[in-house]
C-alpha cells in the first residue's frame, strides 16, 4: 500500500520515516514529498580508458573506476552545476532519508524537468527498507541544451510503500551494504559485488 499525503505527514511527525532537513508540509502532495538537490556532485573525467570491464578482475575494475570518476565536486548554494547534453553525472539529495525495515521508498523525477531532457535516475529509483543516508541521483541530460542545476532546487519526489512485513535483512543492517550511510555522491562500487 502506498502512503497518501496525510499518512506521509503523520509518519514524518511520528518519526517512522525521517527526512533531514525535513521539507515543509507544503512539499507533500497526493502520494509524494518533494526532495531538493544537494551540493555534492561527481562526473566522468576525460580519460583514455577504452571501456570498463564489469565482470573482470576486481583490482582492474577498481583501477578503471578510479581513473574515470572525478573527486567529489562541491557546489555552493549560490552556484550552478552545468550538465551538458549526453552527459551523466552523480549528485545527492539535500535531504538524508531514513526508512524502517517495513517501508520501501521510490524516487521519481519531476515532469517539468523531464520535459527539458533531465533524467534524475537512470534506473536505480528504489530506496530499500532500512535505508539511511542521502539518495544519490544519476543525472542524464537527454536534451539539446546544457542545464544549470542549483543546490536546493526541487529535483524529485519520494513515495513510500508499506511492505507485507518487516524485512529480515534491511539495508543498513547488511554487512555487504555498499552505500551504507552515504552522505556524498559516491560512485559505483560494482567492484565490491560478490
UniProtKB/Swiss-Prot annotation:
InterPro entries: dCTP_deaminase, dUTPase-like_sf, dUTPase_trimeric. The active site is at 138 (proton donor/acceptor). SUPFAM superfamilies: dUTPase-like. Signal peptide: none annotated. DCTP binds at residues 110-115, 128, 136-138, 171, 178, 182. Its EC number is 3.5.4.13. GO terms for biological process: dUMP biosynthetic process; dUTP biosynthetic process; nucleobase-containing small molecule interconversion. Keywords: Hydrolase, Nucleotide metabolism, Nucleotide-binding. One of its GO terms (molecular function) is dCTP deaminase activity. It comes from the Bacteria. It is an enzyme of class 3 (hydrolase). Gene3D superfamilies: 2.70.40.10. It catalyses: dCTP + H2O + H(+) = dUTP + NH4(+). Pfam families: DCD (PF22769). Pathway: Pyrimidine metabolism; dUMP biosynthesis; dUMP from dCTP (dUTP route): step 1/2. Catalyzes the deamination of dCTP to dUTP. Homotrimer. Belongs to the dCTP deaminase family. This is dCTP deaminase.
Amino acid at each position: 500500500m502506498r502512503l497518501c499525503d496525510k499518512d506521509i505527514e503523520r509518519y514524518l511527525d511520528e518519526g517512522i520515516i525521517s527526512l533531514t532537513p525535513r521539507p515543509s508540509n507544503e512539499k507533500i502532495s497526493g502520494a509524494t514529498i518533494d526532495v531538493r538537490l544537494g551540493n555534492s556532485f561527481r562526473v566522468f573525467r576525460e580519460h583514455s580508458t577504452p571501456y570498463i570491464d564489469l565482470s573482470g578482475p576486481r583490482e582492474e575494475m577498481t583501477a578503471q573506476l578510479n581513473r574515470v570518476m572525478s573527486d567529489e565536486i562541491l557546489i555552493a548554494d549560490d552556484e550552478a552545476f552545468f550538465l551538458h547534453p549526453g552527459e551523466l553525472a552523480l549528485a545527492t539529495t539535500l535531504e538524508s532519508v531514513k526508512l524502517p525495515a517495513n517501508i520501501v521508498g521510490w524516487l521519481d523525477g519531476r515532469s517539468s524537468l523531464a520535459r527539458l531532457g533531465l533524467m534524475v535516475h537512470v534506473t536505480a529509483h528504489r530506496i530499500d527498507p532500512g535505508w539511511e543516508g542521502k539518495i544519490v541521483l544519476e543525472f542524464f541530460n537527454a536534451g539539446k541544451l546544457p542545464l544549470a542545476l542549483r543546490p536546493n532546487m526541487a529535483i524529485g519526489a519520494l513515495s513510500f510503500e508499506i511492505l507485507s512485513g518487516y524485512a529480515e535483512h534491511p539495508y543498513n543492517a547488511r554487512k555487504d551494504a555498499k552505500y551504507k550511510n552515504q552522505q556524498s555522491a559516491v560512485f559505483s562500487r560494482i567492484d565490491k559485488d560478490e
